[in-house]
Regions:
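Coupling and communication elements adjacent to P-loop NTPase active sites across diverse families
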Residues: 1-70, 81
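ABC ATP-binding cassette signature C-motif
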Residues: 52-245
Length: 245
């Protein structure tokens, strides 16, 4: 009798476990269906990149970056041409974000040669979105973009209208990143510099961003660790080596 009770208990546990697994599988199927439905319904994101008159818009020759007296990036040679998507790749602390900021004109010490094409219009997405605050219309006006267009793009990135009534500081990390991405998509630029654009971004929005880049082929310089994303957009990689004097 004791054995039968034990076997019955084990059978009940196995049935319960099987039910949980089945429920999880069903949930995954429903989520996939919802994602596909969203993709079918969603309007495509649009971008209107500019083409610079120079074929090469960025060129670095034997470029080294410094934090104070410490060299953090070894001699680096690369260029970005019109219509190219280039990803800087390297370990944390190797100066990838600093390289982007140096190209943007920030006062970061360097040695070597860095050429930025004259008259180059750049649209920048920062790695850090935590500092964002205020209402979305105020943010748009401050950044010099059309509030209506910004909100239309955010709606395509799965924002509800109710979200626009809340201050940006109350948004999740992913929502804040979407605000920066949508702001960049509002801007006509020769070069789009995006620092870790996929941070906190959901799969649905990620697919839209990949398709956008595949369709419009904007000139881009990115920092992004996700290899699959790089492959999807056909990016060329530039390796940054960490060095210290």
């Amino acid at each position: 009798a004791g054995d039968r009770g034990y076997i019955g208990h084990q059978a009940a546990r196995m049935m319960k476990r099987a039910l949980v697994i089945e429920q999880r599988a069903q949930k995954a199927v429903e989520e996939k269906k919802k994602l596909l439905k969203n993709l079918e319904k969603a309007e495509e994101l649009k971008l209107f990149p500019l083409k610079h008159h120079r074929e090469t818009v960025i060129r670095a020759e034997n470029l080294e970056l410094f934090y104070g007296e410490k060299k953090v990036t070894g001699p680096l040679n690369f260029e970005v041409k019109n219509g190219e998507q280039v990803i800087l790749r390297g370990k944390n602390g190797c100066g990838k974000s600093s390289m982007l900021k140096r190209i943007l004109g920030e006062a970061i010490s360097y040695r070597g040669k860095l050429e930025v094409a004259s008259g180059l219009e750049i649209s920048y997405v920062s790695q850090d979105a935590e500092q964002l605050c205020g209402m979305i219309d105020e943010f748009a006006i401050k950044e010099g973009v059309d509030p209506t267009l910004l909100k239309a793009l955010l709606r395509k990135l799965d924002f509800s209208r109710v979200q626009f009534e809340k201050p940006i500081e109350s948004y999740s990390g992913g929502q804040k990143k979407k605000v920066l991405l949508a702001k960049s998509l509002c801007e006509q630029a020769h070069l789009y510099i995006w620092d870790e654009p996929l941070n906190f971004i959901d799969l649905f929005s990620r697919i839209q961003i990949e398709e956008l880049i595949q369709t419009y082929r904007p000139t881009m310089l990115l920092v992004e660790h996700d290899r699959f994303f790089g492959e999807k957009i056909g990016a060329r990689y530039v390796e940054i080596q960490c060095t210290q004097d």
